[in-house]
Each structure stands twice: as structure tokens, then as C-alpha cells.
Amino acid sequence: MTDASTEPTEPTAPTTPATASTTPAARTKAKVGLRIMHRRYVPYGHAHYAGNLVDGAYSLAAFGDVATEMCIVTDGDEGLFASYSDVQFRSRITAGDVIEISAEIIRVGTRSREMDFEVRVVGRGNQERGASAAEMLDPPIVATTARGVVVVP
């Protein structure tokens, strides 16, 4: 007669094949047309050129911020920027502007998200009315556009 082993054994995780419900693409909330938007004031500390002009890198950094939120919302991860394409600086951004930055998903891959980005100036100082005078712009001015790809785990 043989005795069964009485030594404790480690529980094993069930092994199930990857299914549509467990793949990264199935867990994502990323959908074409999903849009995220930020608004921010452009501080005078970012002016680098005559006339309080802000460099184009300011827009690219803002695109990175809105893309990070998009990845957190859709995939629960900050993601990583892989590339930019078709970056266009269409109008100036100056210190004191209020800008709106948007990202819209245009393609969803298994681990990648392609987005269209836009910075619009929605408010601007009006020095003619006074040193601290400002006004909202209607319509807003499109300042920077780009397309970018982020990857998520």
C-alpha cells in the first residue's frame, strides 16, 4: 500500500490559453474618435524670443502631456511616444496665451495608438486695453498640428 504525500504543495495558477478577453487589444478602451483635451495658461517664463514668443517645443511637450492622459484613460498605462509626423507650426504662441491642446485617436493597433494633435490659442493678452488685459478668441487660432504614435504595453 502506498501512502499519499503529505508535503504541502504550491498552488498552481490555472493555465488558460490567451483569449480575446485577455489580450491587450481586448482590454483597451481605445476607440477611433476618442478625444482628450487640456487647457493651460502659457507662463511668461516660457517666452524665449522677442515679442514674448514661445518656442515650438512647448507645443510638442503639451502633445506629450495629452497623449499620456489618453494612454492612461484607454490602457491604464502612461505609454511611450514612438514618433511624430507632419508637425506644422501654423501660428505663434506667446506668453500670456491660453491654449487648448487636443489629441484624437485615429488608429488603434494591438500596442500602438495613432493620434492627431492640435494646439489652439483660445485666449490672448490685449496690451492695447491695459497691461493685464486679455480676451478669449472666437474663433480660436490653430497654432500647431501634428500626428503622433504612442505605444502601450
Residue ranges and their predicted role:
Residues 85-95:
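Short, structured protein-protein interaction patches enriched in aromatics and acidic/basic residues
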